[in-house]
């Protein structure tokens, strides 16, 4: 939701319980209270003297309002609600709920063509067009993330999508413009990550007649596309770490961490797809870990389970890479995975999923002995 809508939407009244807007409000409260309970906010004064309700109550209330049949299926609030319920499930570590509500979201997308802007209502405002674009790509990124981490299929490949990115307008302040530029860049990297996933997982026993119609991208093409994307990165994004920059806000600094994580994940997956030398994979991981270890703790709090999932994925990819080149990099892989495990384990007090993920990484490190 855009900030203005968020501030004014429910200012005057709470909607009736049978309205889609009420379901959206409850889903939003579930995600917000879960975040507040973890103190995953940049300004802790917002939580002072605040009794934080149980997020499960809001979640249960939102779920109870899902209709058996959608009388107004084009209502944008249903799509927003399912997106937020999916986020809540991911944050809570409930994969069953994640697939349930992501599936409901995709059911509405499929039935009413949300993946194609030409099928959207003609009478919506430019502001709602941008909101719809933002929601679509946010859920797309969430699905690619969960597909990468949990191994499920990508339900809506980007090749079948006809949705633009939200507009960058002259009325935006410089910080918001920088954030939007970064948001677009991250989405581009996720779209490349989808092809890396496809390259690594593509069906190996497809009939020859069909195989020629759905060739995987060549390894060099994938790496070249990633290199071109990085090379064309806006100069604005290179200034997010500069304390003297007008873009040195909390959310832009957090975005810089996000960019580093998704670039590393995509690069390593592309290298694995190319069967690149293990030393190349280790070098990328080492550079990433040095940068990540200097990030403030609050950035990990804000990222929550998503960054833990990504770090666990990096550990598994390092383990796979260590088997190349006659196992000569197993010792190096063990060192890096153990470092990852210790880093993730240290987040246990602020990210609930970190404890078990850290243990998995440490066991994985020992397995590489």
Report the location of each language-model feature.
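C-terminal transcriptional activation/regulatory domains of eukaryotic transcription factors
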Residues: 1-94, 174-177, 238-256, 274-276, ...
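TPR repeat positional signature
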Residues: 24-25, 29, 77-78, 82, ...
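Residue at a conserved register position within TPR or TPR-like alpha-solenoid repeats
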Residues: 89, 147, 269-271, 318
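Fungal C-terminal regulatory tails
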Residues: 162, 195-205, 236-239, 254, ...
């Amino acid at each position: 939701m855009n900030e203005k809508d968020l501030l004014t939407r429910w200012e005057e009244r709470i909607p009736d319980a049978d309205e889609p807007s009420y379901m959206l409000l409850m889903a939003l409260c579930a995600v917000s209270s879960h975040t507040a309970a973890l103190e995953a906010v940049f300004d802790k004064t917002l939580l002072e003297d605040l009794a934080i309700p149980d997020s499960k109550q809001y979640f249960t209330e939102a779920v109870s309002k899902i209709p058996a049949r959608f009388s107004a299926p084009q209502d944008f609030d249903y799509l927003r609600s399912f997106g937020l319920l999916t986020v809540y499930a991911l944050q809570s570590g409930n994969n069953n709920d994640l697939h349930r509500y992501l599936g409901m979201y995709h059911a509405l997308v499929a039935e009413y063509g949300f993946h194609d802007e030409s099928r959207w209502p003609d009478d919506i405002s430019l502001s709602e067009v941008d909101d719809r674009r933002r929601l679509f790509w946010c859920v797309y990124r969430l699905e690619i993330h969960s597909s990468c981490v949990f191994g499920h299929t990508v339900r809506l490949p980007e090749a079948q999508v006809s949705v633009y990115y939200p507009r960058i307008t002259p009325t935006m302040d410089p910080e918001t413009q920088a954030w939007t530029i970064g948001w677009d860049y991250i989405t581009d990297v996720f779209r490349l990550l989808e092809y890396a996933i496809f390259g690594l997982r593509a069906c190996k026993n497809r009939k020859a007649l069909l195989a020629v119609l759905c060739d995987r991208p060549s390894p060099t093409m994938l790496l070249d596309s990633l290199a071109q994307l990085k090379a064309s990165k806006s100069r604005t994004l290179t200034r997010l770490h500069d304390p003297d920059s007008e873009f040195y806000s909390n959310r832009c600094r957090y975005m810089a961490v996000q960019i580093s994580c998704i670039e590393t994940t995509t690069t390593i997956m592309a290298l694995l797809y190319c069967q690149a030398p293990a030393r190349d994979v280790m070098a990328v991981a080492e550079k990433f870990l040095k940068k990540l270890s200097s990030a403030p703790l609050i950035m990990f709090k804000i990222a929550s389970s998503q960054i833990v999932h990504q770090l666990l994925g990096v550990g598994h990819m390092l383990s796979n890479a260590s088997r190349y080149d006659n196992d000569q990099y197993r010792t190096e892989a063990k060192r890096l995975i153990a470092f990852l495990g210790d880093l993730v384990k240290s987040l246990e007090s602020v990210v609930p999923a970190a404890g078990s993920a850290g243990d998995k990484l440490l066991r994985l490190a020992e397995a590489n002995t």
